[in-house]
Amino acid sequence: MRGYHGDRGSHPRPARFADQQHMDVGPAARAPYLLGSREAFSTEPRFCAPRAGLGHISPEGPLSLSEGPSVGPEGGPAGAGVGGGSSTFPRMYPGQGPFDTCEDCVGHPQGKGAPRLPPTLLDQFEKQLPVQQDGFHTLPYQRGPAGAGPGPAPGTGTAPEPRSESPSRIRHLVHSVQKLFAKSHSLEAPGKRDYNGPKAEGRGGSGGDSYPGPGSGGPHTSHHHHHHHHHHHHQSRHGKRSKSKDRKGDGRHQAKSTGWWSSDDNLDSDSGFLAGGRPPGEPGGPFCLEGPDGSYRDLSFKGRSGGSEGRCLACTGMSMSLDGQSVKRSAWHTMMVSQGRDGYPGAGPGKGLLGPETKAKARTYHYLQVPQDDWGGYPTGGKDGEIPCRRMRSGSYIKAMGDEESGDSDGSPKTSPKAVARRFTTRRSSSVDQARINCCVPPRIHPRSSIPGYSRSLTTGQLSDELNQQLEAVCGSVFGELESQAVDALDLPGCFRMRSHSYLRAIQAGCSQDDDCLPLLATPAAVSGRPGSSFNFRKAPPPIPPGSQAPPRISITAQSSTDSAHESFTAAEGPARRCSSADGLDGPAMGARTLELAPVPPRASPKPPTLIIKTIPGREELRSLARQRKWRPSIGVQVETISDSDTENRSRREFHSIGVQVEEDKRRARFKRSNSVTAGVQADLELEGLAGLATVATEDKALQFGRSFQRHASEPQPGPRAPTYSVFRTVHTQGQWAYREGYPLPYEPPATDGSPGPAPAPTPGPGAGRRDSWIERGSRSLPDSGRASPCPRDGEWFIKMLRAEVEKLEHWCQQMEREAEDYELPEEILEKIRSAVGSTQLLLSQKVQQFFRLCQQSMDPTAFPVPTFQDLAGFWDLLQLSIEDVTLKFLELQQLKANSWKLLEPKEEKKVPPPIPKKPLRGRGVPVKERSLDSVDRQRQEARKRLLAAKRAASFRHSSATESADSIEIYIPEAQTRL
């Protein structure tokens, strides 16, 4: 801290008096916690050993802190100075030794006090310590070079402290972090965090190396500390307090109780201890988190009484400002590691699900001072139940959450996983969802910049990098190893497990697999805690150990206007997969759709979500990602969608992509429209060998088909069947799905469907054989479609009908060709025969083949865009129009054949026109005969006119459908893009 001058409100007490003062305090007093630097953070847990009495560790219990104030090498109580046990919680054991001042704990200059054990011996002993002495995962902290070995501290001219990282300092830091937990709700504007704010790099973490900060005033010379060790250690700490330079010379630096607070602005009250953070990059001595002296310490550290969940272990007894001053709340509002829920022993399993924005903001501030405002009301004596953990839900905490509901529900001490899931699924897309984006997802997705554990706070763009570094320094050292172990053990997709109560429970009660706790430390062996635990974004929902109760869920909530891009994993694959993604969806319909897919059994090898967010810095990028994702469906059907008609089969394969984004709603509207069978939309039937023809609507009614095939100009998207541009195109059905034309077959221009009769010469045999095999296979296979059809006309039925039509047409073609060969027919009749046969072959090779492929697709369970039966019916109706045209030609040929291939009708037709002009010219005497003559012609002509009118009407409907299809083709993509 800044200057610790004697006039700070308590007289400077030399370290030699620290023992007596702390002895006065009695068992309530605690040893300060000295944290090692965050230097090379070893993955295996380190356990700090007491300085005096190395062999003093009971295998099953923590080193009892009640061993009495056995004087350590420095004259301080060994138990206090070293933190008799690896216990990370201050008051775990009733008999803990009295506090010794941080100065005692901090390495004194060489020659001051009894020499400590060599750091190497301490290191060896620590390595030999049992892995979990007291059932806690004691947070391992590797000593920085300054703290670990001799050598003058950088910022101090004094001799180096041999071991500046005592377990007491570790405990102190843990304690401070707990206090920080308790006050993690105080999230106001970070404006006044100057003291421990961005410039904290100037603060040397511990006495080992004090980097004179910009405002630190350089070495201790500027701050006349009480003792050189006192002053050495404090200088190291406030050496980093860059923003305190203005306070360097004034009396505000004098610590109240042996200079615990140097920063007048918010440290006026002794309500917290500053955990001096060092930017993660700086090597240096460990942090010295000093406990207050004597009476102040009794107030500030209270034993956990009765395990009441409402009390923050670290903060319940936090001394209220002895001088009545209150810390400026604005200064310390955000100084919490936001591990708050963890600090509450009684937190329920769901308690870890805190407001994500709170977490995000909280993790950026690691300073442990707590606003005096919230606690100022409590007596300085500090009752046990003073600071309930539920204060996490109060005021600014909820403000940060932006959602009181989420704050209350998340803050509730014991939230059942069901309740949590219910809240998550019912909560609308409010700040909580966005917070979940910022909080839940990034742990898995942010590459953590090689900083252990919580070191990288989730920057929401408003938190400065220096604060992140400070948080990384403190929280990384405190929670790095344990979090990496917990996250790796659980393989959680999103939530910071460290946030959850179980982290503290594991540390506090040593219950690595308590019933209430997730098996945080269930697999510590398998998890070598990575120093730079960068949570790689695992693309599939990872498995969670069986004991997990409140499975965190990653919810990549790309909240956009449509929000179909909302991917959600449910971390635990419970009996009913809960999708928490419904919250972010704009409408309940979309949410319901997302949840409908939830119970789908997880696939063996889950497909990565379509939206893989590598980093989620903020909501804007999510919006951009959502927009990118929205754009895709506008140019075609999204390939990875679950077909409503084939949900049973496809949902397993495509669980995470919930369908066409914007067409999700449009599909249903179009599906309703498509019930009118003839409301057709064109799709040209020209040879599709060229990809460019996919978007061209030809006007030839003979080459138009499809009631409800609306073609968007969409190039084939990579899908289950990677289409080749030469063969495939995507036809978007108005009913539901885009399906790929050219399904398994290349377009064979004159190919006719396999028929028993001899096929015309142009028909290629292989194509027919392939289709025959498909017909046989399709006829044996039941239509695999989940869509209930209003009529029994399914793909199989249509194939049968189509086969009958094809056989009839082919029979006519063969008959006419034989007639042409057998008889010497006039050229006009031959032209008619060629016209009829050519039209028939064209029809068979294109429209019939296309419809046959549609029928195949409707029966093929592996086909991706399964045409609905309504689509088949509409196409069949349009196909009947073309068949009718061909049939008329053959009927005419049949008449000619019946007339011995004499062109009778053409002669009569020549006669027919004259009667029309002759009517007015003829006299009234003749008309009877002519009427009798004309009556036959007239009837014939009227019938022909009616037929032509019917054909024109059909072709007009067809062309109008084509035009409407063109317009739809133009506008629907725009609508989708707008949406």
From Swiss-Prot:
<feature type="compositionally biased region" description="Gly residues">
    <location>
        <begin position="73"/>
        <end position="86"/>
    </location>
</feature>
<feature type="compositionally biased region" description="Gly residues">
    <location>
        <begin position="203"/>
        <end position="218"/>
    </location>
</feature>
<feature type="modified residue" description="Phosphoserine">
    <location>
        <position position="643"/>
    </location>
</feature>
<feature type="compositionally biased region" description="Basic and acidic residues">
    <location>
        <begin position="927"/>
        <end position="940"/>
    </location>
</feature>
<feature type="region of interest" description="Disordered">
    <location>
        <begin position="136"/>
        <end position="169"/>
    </location>
</feature>
<feature type="compositionally biased region" description="Pro residues">
    <location>
        <begin position="540"/>
        <end position="549"/>
    </location>
</feature>
<feature type="modified residue" description="Phosphoserine">
    <location>
        <position position="967"/>
    </location>
</feature>
<feature type="compositionally biased region" description="Basic and acidic residues">
    <location>
        <begin position="769"/>
        <end position="779"/>
    </location>
</feature>
<feature type="modified residue" description="Phosphoserine">
    <location>
        <position position="935"/>
    </location>
</feature>
<dbReference type="Pfam" id="PF03359">
    <property type="entry name" value="GKAP"/>
</dbReference>
<feature type="modified residue" description="Phosphoserine">
    <location>
        <position position="416"/>
    </location>
</feature>
<feature type="region of interest" description="Disordered">
    <location>
        <begin position="741"/>
        <end position="790"/>
    </location>
</feature>
<keyword id="KW-0472">Membrane</keyword>
<comment type="similarity">
    <text>Belongs to the SAPAP family.</text>
</comment>
<dbReference type="GO" id="GO:0031594">
    <property type="term" value="C:neuromuscular junction"/>
</dbReference>
<feature type="modified residue" description="Phosphoserine">
    <location>
        <position position="58"/>
    </location>
</feature>
<feature type="modified residue" description="Phosphoserine">
    <location>
        <position position="932"/>
    </location>
</feature>
<dbReference type="GO" id="GO:0098981">
    <property type="term" value="C:cholinergic synapse"/>
</dbReference>
<dbReference type="GO" id="GO:0050804">
    <property type="term" value="P:modulation of chemical synaptic transmission"/>
</dbReference>
<feature type="region of interest" description="Disordered">
    <location>
        <begin position="908"/>
        <end position="940"/>
    </location>
</feature>
<feature type="region of interest" description="Disordered">
    <location>
        <begin position="537"/>
        <end position="581"/>
    </location>
</feature>
<feature type="region of interest" description="Disordered">
    <location>
        <begin position="182"/>
        <end position="291"/>
    </location>
</feature>
<dbReference type="GO" id="GO:0014069">
    <property type="term" value="C:postsynaptic density"/>
</dbReference>
<feature type="region of interest" description="Disordered">
    <location>
        <begin position="1"/>
        <end position="20"/>
    </location>
</feature>
<dbReference type="InterPro" id="IPR005026">
    <property type="entry name" value="SAPAP"/>
</dbReference>
<protein>
    <recommendedName>
        <fullName>Disks large-associated protein 3</fullName>
    </recommendedName>
</protein>
<feature type="compositionally biased region" description="Basic residues">
    <location>
        <begin position="221"/>
        <end position="246"/>
    </location>
</feature>
<keyword id="KW-0770">Synapse</keyword>
<dbReference type="GO" id="GO:0023052">
    <property type="term" value="P:signaling"/>
</dbReference>
<keyword id="KW-0597">Phosphoprotein</keyword>
<keyword id="KW-1003">Cell membrane</keyword>
<feature type="modified residue" description="Phosphoserine">
    <location>
        <position position="412"/>
    </location>
</feature>
<dbReference type="GO" id="GO:0099572">
    <property type="term" value="C:postsynaptic specialization"/>
</dbReference>
<dbReference type="GO" id="GO:0099010">
    <property type="term" value="P:modification of postsynaptic structure"/>
</dbReference>
<dbReference type="GO" id="GO:0060090">
    <property type="term" value="F:molecular adaptor activity"/>
</dbReference>
<feature type="region of interest" description="Disordered">
    <location>
        <begin position="52"/>
        <end position="95"/>
    </location>
</feature>
<feature type="modified residue" description="Phosphoserine">
    <location>
        <position position="645"/>
    </location>
</feature>
<feature type="modified residue" description="Phosphoserine">
    <location>
        <position position="406"/>
    </location>
</feature>
<feature type="compositionally biased region" description="Basic and acidic residues">
    <location>
        <begin position="190"/>
        <end position="202"/>
    </location>
</feature>
<feature type="modified residue" description="Phosphoserine">
    <location>
        <position position="409"/>
    </location>
</feature>
<dbReference type="GO" id="GO:0005886">
    <property type="term" value="C:plasma membrane"/>
</dbReference>
<comment type="function">
    <text>May play a role in the molecular organization of synapses and neuronal cell signaling. Could be an adapter protein linking ion channel to the subsynaptic cytoskeleton. May induce enrichment of PSD-95/SAP90 at the plasma membrane.</text>
</comment>
